[in-house]
Amino acid sequence: TNRNFLRF
């Protein structure tokens, strides 16, 4: 899973 989406 991309942790980049956790920024939202």
From Swiss-Prot:
Cellular location of this protein?
Secreted
Record's keyword terms, sorted: Amidation, Neuropeptide, Secreted
Q: Which GO terms describe its biological process?
A: neuropeptide signaling pathway
Q: Which domain of life is it from?
A: Eukaryota
Q: Does the keyword DNA-binding apply?
A: no
Answer whether the UniProt record assigns the keyword NADP to this protein: no
Sites where Phenylalanine amide occurs are at F8
Q: Name one GO cellular component term.
A: extracellular region
Recorded family membership = Belongs to the FARP (FMRFamide related peptide) family.
Q: What is the role of the protein in this entry? A: Can act as a modulator of exoskeletal and cardiac neuromuscular junctions.
Q: What is this protein called?
A: FMRFamide-like neuropeptide 4
Organism of derivation: Homarus americanus
